[in-house]
């Protein structure tokens, strides 16, 4: 039915594109008018637009003319002009949607249109890229357009200090990576002076490679951590316990969902081993958490696939790029559990000071938009979770790439032999080949096989840097063979015949020019010195030579069929396969793609290889004989759809849990901002006092409506101990006239008198600052502990499913109670401190951070920062158990430690 409707009316994207075409035509109609303006007149348009907005016009009203101004500025500064389809892409982004644009269609240039338009409001625009290299490249490259039009441009890079960051955020348009934007938000909510905050309000973000950031990275929380105090003994103990368990008997593994859980038998073994009655009890949360992480380390995490052990350290392997993530650690104690499993030194668990998922960070922007070459397969997720719809933008020239059907082999060895033969054949005739692999290990295996055959090639697994961009840019040269892990080099176009700009820059390096001079020389902005002016002349000479060379080679490569892309395995997500395919056939060039698959590949092993294997066996097919059929390609796509569905459900499920924490975070951060913004907190403090008194009046009068039966002495003793002066409250009301409200009023009036006295003693101005210092300190300390507790609750909540309770409902209920306890605890500690504080009038008080951040879980790109070394305190047998049960260590987790 849907197919019939689409045939008659066109797909959703086609209808949307048709609807936006008249606006794009209007933009193009300004071309001659803009071309007649001088540079100064074109620049003056920016102020004219700002004034029109002040006078009541909207961004939509000025869009056609503003886009036309950017188009002309791009031509004058970069000799680039937006095509009609790029203008449509720009409109889609301005509307807060996702524009799916194929590789090579100029997404970087498209973003300049909505970025300029939205920056006119003066509230800031963030352009989000996947790595520092692209952020800096795009700021320097596209920044020329904005600066020509009088707007300021900033970039946030990993190693920048707070002052530089603040300046970059104050710019009209700011480039940076998703991680840097997210971490700055967290750091801003840890500062103790408002002036130390670097970000402005989160107004409008354009996310490049939006699928990579909002889907592939969505499950990765950003974590800022400090040094924890917990002992690491518990990890070793949990590891010892897990080694005694039998798979399927004591625990079950769900490979598809990457989850592991104890069976009832396993739970009984845990209770016996740790000497506890009920593992699901709230006081055993810590033990349950450690067991869960040890199970995950043994049953789910595989050495040399998920992590490697190098120089006595466990180093994570990025599942999407195959890179080693130096300085990054798994959170929630999983890293320590793997260290215990591998027998290396178990590093002390860091304490989480602040955390947020990318999903929740980006949902805070007033308006969000994204660009990618592949979003349609995840359209439902973008719509459900972010409220973003996907519009597929047509290509500027028709797509003529040939996508061959998949070829399936029985074994991985046979598959790789076939891949090598294919590469050898293509290389002989000079056709460039790009091979995509799923891991470093597979890249190296293929590289070794090609070396044996004497085929020259480049291997890309390294961390992101300019060298990688250069290799990927030259992957379209005649006879080039490039092996790359899935996402390596994203953001850089592969031009058939080679990229003349990279060739010219390399020649300048060989001639002895510095990188800084080359980068400035290759630009279009004003030159900073005579040296740069001469370098620019030389650069354009070399560029012309390189263009002649690449144009000739381009023709030859086109005749050979263009770039040939080989996929050595199907990824779990069709989108990642489409990204690899999309490297070929850019901007109307010819190209080919083919996937080689074996029944031993992860996807085939988990989903649907049985039927294919039986078919191959029944036909008596040997290892080196492939099968190739469209039906099989369809079956593989079905398997991928199944995995995508599972992964979407997991992300949605995680988001439901994370939403609980997110609401709590918003409340705490909003309160914190009020404190920083210098509000008079006296009224808030007295409200806390009243709230505490009401709460305890309720507790001590519960069970009876008769005042003579109330425990008034117990109530007052408790409040004296907490914050009031001893014996200061006089209740001179007849019992028959006493009710809870009257009792609360009497105590509250005395509490206010005591607070006024304290203020008179210290001085009002000093008292206001003390209120701020105390409240910040208490909120931060309590919030950090609360993050840990919520984390453990989430880890252990699965055990509740045994009691036929929906874990999510139970989690929400307990989390609500815990948050209420947190608020009460903040109130009580704040009031206690303020009533008891002793301050010398002449002393100048200073605010201090509760905990110093020492690391983030994502240290830039391959940034190998040493973690601080922390001296570990040994737990004595009679000390309180580090698991938090309240028992002595020897009676609890130390019962099995000799």
UniProtKB/Swiss-Prot annotation:
GO terms for biological process: intracellular protein transmembrane transport; protein import; protein targeting; protein transport by the Sec complex. Its cofactor is Zn(2+). Keywords: ATP-binding, Cell membrane, Cytoplasm, Membrane, Metal-binding, Nucleotide-binding, Protein transport, Translocase, Translocation, Transport, Zinc. May bind 1 zinc ion per subunit. It catalyses: ATP + H2O + cellular proteinSide 1 = ADP + phosphate + cellular proteinSide 2. It is found in: Cell membrane; Cytoplasm. Residues 862-877 have a biased composition (Basic and acidic residues). One of its GO terms (cellular component) is plasma membrane. ATP binds at residues 86, 104-108, 493. Zn(2+) binds at residues 881, 883, 892-893. Residues 850-885 are annotated as: Disordered. It is an enzyme of class 7 (translocase). It comes from the Bacteria. Its EC number is 7.4.2.8. Belongs to the SecA family. Part of the Sec protein translocase complex. Interacts with the SecYEG preprotein conducting channel. Has a central role in coupling the hydrolysis of ATP to the transfer of proteins into and across the cell membrane, serving as an ATP-driven molecular motor driving the stepwise translocation of polypeptide chains across the membrane. Monomer and homodimer. Part of the essential Sec protein translocation apparatus which comprises SecA, SecYEG and auxiliary proteins SecDF. Other proteins may also be involved. This is Protein translocase subunit SecA.
